[in-house]
Amino acid sequence: MTIDKRVDCIKLAKAVIRQTRNDVLISKTQMTDIAARCNRNRTTVSRALDAEDMTLSMWFASVSESEIDPLQLITEKIQEQSALADALENATANNANSKEEN
């Protein structure tokens, strides 16, 4: 699978981290367990999840400790962001067509 060039990579990354945060909270994974896996402190992990930005090693630790399938998570978010890019492109094209008709 590749990432469509129309997909905003920043939005994609934030969506992946946001879903990871939700899954961590749902699974009741301890921040101290994630922190131990990535050699960070608990507060740093918690803040990174809230900020929707983190290092790859911290993300791997988060999905591992929460028993999340990282490939499935990324695949779902790529598909969602691709669908949003398609919808935006179609809406823009439809708007341009309606202006031409007027």
Features from the language model and the residues they span:
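A short, Lys/Arg-rich alpha-helix, primarily the initiator
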Residues: 1-33
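Short, charged recognition helix plus adjacent turn
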Residues: 1-7, 74-102
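Helix-turn-helix DNA-binding elements, focusing on the entry/boundary residues of the two helices
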Residues: 31, 42, 56-59
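Recognition helix of helix-turn-helix/homeodomain-like DNA-binding domains
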Residues: 38-54
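Key DNA-contacting residues within the recognition helix of helix-turn-helix
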Residues: 46-47, 60, 74
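Short, basic-rich loop-to-helix N-cap that marks the start of a DNA-contacting helix
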Residues: 51-64
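The DNA-recognition helices of helix-turn-helix-type DNA-binding domains
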Residues: 52, 66, 77-81
